[in-house]
């Protein structure tokens, strides 16, 4: 089976003085979360579409779904975790407790605040996860990347045509993800900022799927302005 996990755990600290977490902020007259969710509802492959959100925002999430007449029976709202990867594993535990997990089950995880993903990106994630077990959505790095350990001087300048910028979805064979996460130490888990690194840290390959430049993550006031411009310009019509 195929599952979607929408990560709505952010509290929007980088968005500044706003009354709601960023996933509930208005974008073209409806919350960012609703834009994102609508993309997944259009994909019939999913057995469940699971939204993971902080406990204190679960009721608000359900109220928002009702307000915007989102009634797809596949949608479930659960409590997120203490961080990104803990939230993903909470979704996995929920799937296991309600449906069980088969060897070929996959999960497509996606940031709630990336509302411009496309049908193509979702379908290619599903297919790549079924074929390869783990997949990351990326775009080519446009700018030269430099690394610095002291925040003062350059340590290295990697070859740009080998660099990519990570997006979401990130998709996995569920058993592979569970087994890989269980192999990590508590220290490794504490510094993870990316789900695909769970797989990389256990020396397993992660397939790349090409994203889109406009598949942005809305985390700052500037991002919100860009997102509104994308909608007004009709850039992301897929």
Curated annotation (Swiss-Prot):
Transmembrane intervals: none
Pathway: Cell wall biogenesis; poly(ribitol phosphate) teichoic acid biosynthesis
Entry keyword annotation includes Calcium: no
Top-level taxon in the UniProt lineage: Bacteria
Alphabetized PANTHER family for the sequence: 2-C-METHYL-D-ERYTHRITOL 4-PHOSPHATE CYTIDYLYLTRANSFERASE, CHLOROPLASTIC, RIBITOL-5-PHOSPHATE CYTIDYLYLTRANSFERASE
The protein's name: Ribitol-5-phosphate cytidylyltransferase 1
UniProt site positions, description: Transition state stabilizer: 14, 22
KW Cell wall biogenesis/degradation (keyword) present: yes
Chain's role: Catalyzes the transfer of the cytidylyl group of CTP to D-ribitol 5-phosphate.
Site (Positions ribitol 5-phosphate for the nucleophilic attack) location in chain: 160, 217
GO biological process, one term: isoprenoid biosynthetic process
EC number in record: 2.7.7.40
Top EC category: transferase
The entry's keywords: Cell wall biogenesis/degradation, Nucleotidyltransferase, Teichoic acid biosynthesis, Transferase
Record family assignment: Belongs to the IspD/TarI cytidylyltransferase family. TarI subfamily.
InterPro entries for this protein: IspD/TarI (IPR034683), IspD/TarI_cytidylyltransf_bact (IPR050088), ISPD_synthase_CS (IPR018294), Nucleotide-diphossugar_trans (IPR029044), TarI (IPR034709)
Gene: tarI1
């Amino acid at each position: 089976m195929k599952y979607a996990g929408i990560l709505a755990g952010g509290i929007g600290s980088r968005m500044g003085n706003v009354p709601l977490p960023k996933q509930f902020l208005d974008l073209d007259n409806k919350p960012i979360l609703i834009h994102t969710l609508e993309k997944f509802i259009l994909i019939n492959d999913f057995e469940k579409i699971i939204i993971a959100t902080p406990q204190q925002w679960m009721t608000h999430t359900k109220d928002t779904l009702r307000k915007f007449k989102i009634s797809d029976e596949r949608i479930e709202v659960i409590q997120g975790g203490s961080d990104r990867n803990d939230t993903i594993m909470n979704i996995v535990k929920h799937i296991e407790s309600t449906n069980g997990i088969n060897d070929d089950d996959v999960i497509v995880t996606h940031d709630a605040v990336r509302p411009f993903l496309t049908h193509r990106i979702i379908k290619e994630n599903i297919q790549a996860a079924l074929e390869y077990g783990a997949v990351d959505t990326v775009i080519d790095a446009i700018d030269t990347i430099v690394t610095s350990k002291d925040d003062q001087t350059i340590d290295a300048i990697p070859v740009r045509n080998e660099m990519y910028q990570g997006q979401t979805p990130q998709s996995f064979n569920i058993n592979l993800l569970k087994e890989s996460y269980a192999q990590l130490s508590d220290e490794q888990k504490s510094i993870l900022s990316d789900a695909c690194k769970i797989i990389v840290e256990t020396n397993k390959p992660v397939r790349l799927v090409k994203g889109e430049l406009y598949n942005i993550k809305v985390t700052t006031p500037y991002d919100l302005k860009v997102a509104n411009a994308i909608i007004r310009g009709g850039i992301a019509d897929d």
